[in-house]
Amino acid sequence: MECYLDNSATTKPCKAAVDAEISALTELYGNPSSLHQKGVDAYMLLEKSRGTIAASLKASPDEIYFTPCGTVSNNTAIFGAVGAKKRLGKKIVTTALEHPSVEKCMERLEESGFEVVRGQPQSDGHISLKDFENAIDENTILVSVMAVNNEVGSVMPTENLKKIIKSKNSPALLHVDDVQGYMKIPLCPKNCGIDLMSVSAHKVHGPKGVGALYINKNVRINPYILGGGQENNMCSGTQGMPAIAGFAC
């Protein structure tokens, strides 16, 4: 008998997720942007799913934006935040342990002239909050960290980061990549002062090909993927309703 032990990389979709996907594929296959009945039915499913994901984060439905995956959520958060805040500073604070979907963004921003400061891990894999206290200043426009590390399992005390940002009179937005910790370790973005938070379905027995980005309703970032204006202009492209339905089942 096979024993699958790689659930930190991905999980087997549960039966409810598979059934929800099949139903959306075979019955609710309309484009949620269409005005005819099939489109309206798909739109209703979309918004019901948005409410479900919002409830899991103790957020409002209008703070949840569906994306094709956690990587797109991270890219959208980082480039969107920097685009909106770049007139206020050129410094970004992160860690040396981030997922490639964050680290590669940082490398691109460095090439564009931004300063990126990376907190270094201690022997136990944790990043000292002192690193953030020393790095964050009035020129910092974004702090981006992983809530739970996907390789060493260290947990970032995200609830303390916003306090540090405020104590430094910094305009920085706080982005948390919670793809690994979502639905495993409780994390309420509002209670922790998180402005942007990325999650994904395939780590929690949902389908691959869908993620979500929480954006606090008082925060404005620039759209990253341009096109037809779906997801309130934040992530254009026809929504993948089967995957979204499986995510929110």
Regions found by a protein language model. Give the residues of each.
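Pyridoxal 5′-phosphate
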Residues: M1-C249
